[in-house]
């Protein structure tokens, strides 16, 4: 992992925090690299992974998701409740992370971006939240 890659990770984290997101994948900022940054706001801090992959998944959860790439849209998405993710951290160390609940959801959402998928492909009850008091049903 070189300085240029670390700078990209720093920029991605800054973008994620400025937009009040909990995750960001490199393709969302027009970079064709397999990098994600994640912070589930539980106090454990930023997680940055290069070449992340889900090596184990179990259970099921359905919950609401939105995305910085599809502003204003929200929908319910079924995801695994527990995942094991392997990747390389910014210090060039191989890491394995076991996540469940919200953090597991974020990992799956961001890794989907690396595979060219958006949450709206999996969402039910997709809706557009506007500045108006009513919600607009899409699907």
Each model region followed by its residue ranges:
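Positively charged
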Residues: 1-139
């Amino acid at each position: 992992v070189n300085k240029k890659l670390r700078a990209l990770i720093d920029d991605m984290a800054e973008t994620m925090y400025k937009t009040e997101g909990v995750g960001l994948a490199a393709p969302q900022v027009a970079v064709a690299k397999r990098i994600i940054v994640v912070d589930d706001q539980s106090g454990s801090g930023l997680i940055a992974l290069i070449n992340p992959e889900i090596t184990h998944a179990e259970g099921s959860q359905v919950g609401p998701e939105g995305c910085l790439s599809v502003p204003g849209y929200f929908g319910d998405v079924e995801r695994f409740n527990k995942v094991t993710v392997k990747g390389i951290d910014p210090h060039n160390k191989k890491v394995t992370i076991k996540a469940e609940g919200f953090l597991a959801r974020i990992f799956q959402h961001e890794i989907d971006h690396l595979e060219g998928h958006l949450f709206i492909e999996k969402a039910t009850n997709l809706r557009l939240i506007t500045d108006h008091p009513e919600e607009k049903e899409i699907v």
